[in-house]
Amino acid sequence: MNTKKEEVVSSPEATVEKKQTQSQTPIVSRDKLLEAGAYFGHKKQMWHPKMKEFIVPKRLNKNAHIIDIVKTQKYLEFAYSLVEKLAAKGVSFIFVGTKRQAKKTVKEAAERTNSLYVSERWLGGTLTNNSVIMKRVQKMNELDKKAEQGFKGYTKKEALLLQKQLDKLHQNLDGIKNMRRLPQVMIVTDLVEDKIAIQEAKKKKIKIIGIVDTNVDPTVIDFGIPANDDSSKSINLIVNILADAIAKTQGKKQMYAYQPDDKIVLSNPHELKKSEEASEVKAASTKEKLTEEASQ
């Protein structure tokens, strides 16, 4: 990853090895990473050369790349330690994940850690033109007061239009309505889907930690965790482990980090969409092969 920024990253391998001499409990088991589908990358023709070191060289799957979950585990543990240290210093965070698989996880992780978040459309200028965004927040607050009074003085049609406008403002602004200053660290779930957010963060010198799949350049952000960024289970696991690091400094319970496998519930299988179910079925044979290799 972008190791030149030494105030943010150093050596994941060195940090994890040092920790594991103190405790044999990993931040999350490889079995749980397999269950989450964290190893499943994109089609081979979509790969980015800078992700080569994180891809399993053996041809376990003819069509798609397989991410090395040993490295996923190491980089995730390092990211957890990094976030914990930053949170202990009072650093502020913003979680960003606007695609379907990430929305719910990002919102819930941010809310339980009292962090900012964007889970709907990223509004241009959220970080680079914050005064305009805050004017929208002010407008939302004004409409809230009118709504509390039943939109008194407005016709039924006008009230319906104002309520529709208010609902849209809440959808886009609820996660940043309490932003009094710019966040210092961004946690992002998809480098492609949320590239505008990343561009704005870099302009404002906000540090970025995120999930990097096989189709992206990991050096675009300050620290990346190699993993599947399309599976809701993978996103859920990784984002909540990072949120646990913040929660720990707030004296709150850890949900996923350093927990037994049977205590980690990734998602309700009935909530999975057909596209994700198909992806998981396709990955099943690969998972079996990886499990066999890990046990050898």
Curated annotation (Swiss-Prot):
Gene3D superfamilies: Glucose-6-phosphate isomerase like protein, domain 1, Helix hairpin bin. One of its GO terms (cellular component) is small ribosomal subunit. Pfam families: Ribosomal_S2. Residues 1-24, 270-296 are annotated as: Disordered. Coiled coil: none annotated. GO terms for molecular function: structural constituent of ribosome. GO terms for biological process: translation. NCBIfam families: rpsB_bact (TIGR01011). PANTHER family: 30S RIBOSOMAL PROTEIN S2 PROKARYOTIC AND ORGANELLAR, SMALL RIBOSOMAL SUBUNIT PROTEIN US2M. HAMAP family: Ribosomal_uS2_B (MF_00291_B). This is Small ribosomal subunit protein uS2.
